[in-house]
């Protein structure tokens, strides 16, 4: 086997480089490169060579196959080192004297001086935009799972929604729909019509009208109005009966409490009259 070994000028003095050609196999003709230290130790790869030399030599630009230093990599590394050293030497002075604290807007009203070149111009403002705060989509779902209790700490039974009301959106239950409609009745002055767009069922995250509750569009018929009127009349009648019973009970309680003091006062008046009759009249001289 033909072996050629010669001195490697890129490495320290005494290091030799050897090329061994392969005679057979799929990689026939390929040459294996080895390096030998002055003591005769053999190295088969660049990592072995770097571990052996350690910090005595920089092998970042060394080509293990050719045994030479790559000049383009050497120039780039020199430029990088020169740039880093110049930055470290010069540096930018920190002239900022502000305290390193977060600057937030003041919650207190502060005077503002208005300077303008056109005093006749008027500033237009829309107070409605400042009042209406943006809301999350499907924020009504946060109200689901909440229950109401009366003064006796008993659970209040939730009302049943009409059959014509159907929810819209992912995971919209009857409880969520009831909370959404109740919130719309208390927080909005607009008429409740539901989601009028038909595309909201395909992609509610895009076509949802945030001004309306999470329900499909519905129509209020005369039959619905009649049923609601009957329900209101029944509730009013029950309320009237309850108020009347409470008033009668209150009157009876006052009557029972007023009998004893009244009898006692009458008895005291009779005793005073008897004492006045028993007193003798003074004799006349």
UniProtKB/Swiss-Prot annotation:
Record organism: Mus musculus
Subcellular location, principal: nucleus
A GO MF label: DNA binding
Subunit structure: Heterodimer (via N-terminus) with MBD2. Component of the MeCP1 histone deacetylase complex. Component of the nucleosome remodeling and deacetylase (NuRD) repressor complex, composed of core proteins MTA1, MTA2, MTA3, RBBP4, RBBP7, HDAC1, HDAC2, MBD2, MBD3, and peripherally associated proteins CDK2AP1, CDK2AP2, GATAD2A, GATAD2B, CHD3, CHD4 and CHD5. The exact stoichiometry of the NuRD complex is unknown, and some subunits such as MBD2 and MBD3, GATAD2A and GATAD2B, and CHD3, CHD4 and CHD5 define mutually exclusive NuRD complexes.
Entry coiled-coil feature ranges: 221-279
Pfam annotation, one family: MBD
Subcellular location: Nucleus; Chromosome
Function summary: Acts as a component of the histone deacetylase NuRD complex which participates in the remodeling of chromatin. Acts as transcriptional repressor and plays a role in gene silencing. Does not bind methylated DNA by itself. Binds to a lesser degree DNA containing unmethylated CpG dinucleotides. Recruits histone deacetylases and DNA methyltransferases.
Positions with biased composition (Basic and acidic residues): 255-267
Tissues expressed in: Highly expressed in brain, heart, kidney, liver, lung, skeletal muscle, spleen and testis. Detected at lower levels in embryonic stem cells.
Protein name: Methyl-CpG-binding domain protein 3
Domain MBD: 1-69
Region Disordered: start-end pairs: 255-285
Signal peptide span: none
Species lineage: Eukaryota, Metazoa, Chordata, Craniata, Vertebrata
Any one Gene Ontology cellular component term annotated for this protein: nucleoplasm
Positions bearing Phosphoserine: 56, 85, 144
Covalent link location (Glycyl lysine isopeptide (Lys-Gly) (interchain with G-Cter in SUMO2)): 73, 90, 92
GO annotation, biological process: chromatin remodeling; embryonic organ development; epigenetic regulation of gene expression; in utero embryonic development; negative regulation of DNA-templated transcription; positive regulation of DNA-templated transcription; regulation of cell fate specification; regulation of stem cell differentiation
CDD domains xref list: MeCP2_MBD
Compositionally biased region (Acidic residues): 268-285
């Amino acid at each position: 086997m033909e072996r050629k070994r010669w001195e490697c000028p890129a490495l320290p003095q005494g290091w030799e480089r050897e090329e061994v050609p392969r005679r057979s196999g799929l990689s026939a003709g390929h040459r294996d490169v080895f390096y030998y230290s002055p003591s005769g130790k053999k190295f088969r790869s660049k990592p072995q060579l770097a571990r052996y030399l350690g910090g005595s030599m920089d092998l970042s630009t060394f080509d293990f196959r050719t045994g030479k230093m790559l000049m383009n990599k050497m120039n780039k590394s020199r430029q990088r080192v020169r740039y880093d050293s110049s930055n470290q030497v010069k540096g930018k002075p920190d002239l900022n004297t502000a305290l390193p604290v977060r600057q937030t807007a003041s919650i207190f009203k502060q005077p503002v001086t208005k300077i303008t070149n056109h005093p006749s111009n008027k500033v237009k403002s829309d107070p409605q935009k400042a009042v209406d705060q943006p809301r999350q989509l499907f924020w009504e779902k946060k109200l689901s799972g909440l229950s109401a209790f009366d003064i006796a700490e008993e659970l209040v039974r939730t009302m049943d929604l009409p059959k014509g009301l159907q929810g819209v959106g992912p995971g919209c239950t009857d409880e969520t729909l009831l909370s959404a409609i109740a919130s719309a009745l208390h927080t909005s002055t607009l008429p409740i019509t539901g989601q009028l767009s038909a595309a909201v069922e395909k992609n509610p995250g895009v076509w949802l009208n945030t001004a309306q509750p999470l329900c499909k569009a519905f129509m209020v018929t005369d039959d619905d109005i009649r049923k609601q009127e009957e329900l209101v009349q029944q509730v009013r009648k029950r309320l009237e009966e309850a108020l009347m019973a409470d008033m009668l009970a209150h009157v009876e309680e006052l009557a029972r409490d007023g009998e004893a003091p009244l009898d006692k006062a009458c008895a005291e008046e009779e005793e005073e009259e008897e004492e006045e009759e028993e007193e003798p009249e003074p004799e006349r001289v």
